[in-house]
Amino acid sequence: MQTIEQQIANVIEESLTDMGFELVLVKFKGVNPKVVEILIDSLNSEKISVEDCTKASRTISAILDVEDLIEAAYSLEVASSGLERPLVKFENYNRFLEREVKIKLKELLNGKTRYQGKIIKAENNKIYLKCEEQEVLIDYDLIKNANLVLTEEVFKKLLKQ
């Protein structure tokens, strides 16, 4: 049985892709009224603008009105996934090779549940990180959550754009 977040993702993802956006995350915040927060990113690595979020929000709102997946009243928030975006799909790790990432695990691996390092490669459901001077192999299924890290190197690249 799919969660409501997965059902929402299933009905909006194709439309967002057609618009040039990647659906990063769907999550609920608050109680009454609920807030449906949807994070998007650009498929072509451009920055997400306020206009992009507005355009995506209108499309998502129309789809959710037709699909009627959410029973109670809710507010819709569409935002950029940001510079420290979450990595929620295995494919994300290949897209962000050589980027710094923070990973929190569901259980201990080598006595730790948190790792930070550069993504070396991602293949066969495994993430290879360079943490300080050692390489760490993490099974993707062990990852509870992961986010990119805003490093000085990334910040300098952004300033040049």
Curated annotation (Swiss-Prot):
Main location: cytoplasm
Family from the record: Belongs to the RimP family.
A Pfam cross-reference name: RimP_N
GO CC field: cytosol
NCBIfam families per UniProt: PRK00092.4-3
Compartmental location: Cytoplasm
HAMAP family: RimP
Record-linked InterPro entries: Ribosome_maturation_RimP, RimP_C, RimP_C_sf, RimP_N, RimP_N_sf
Keywords: Cytoplasm, Ribosome biogenesis
Function: Required for maturation of 30S ribosomal subunits.
One example of a Gene Ontology biological process annotation: translation
Protein known as: Ribosome maturation factor RimP
Transmembrane segments: none
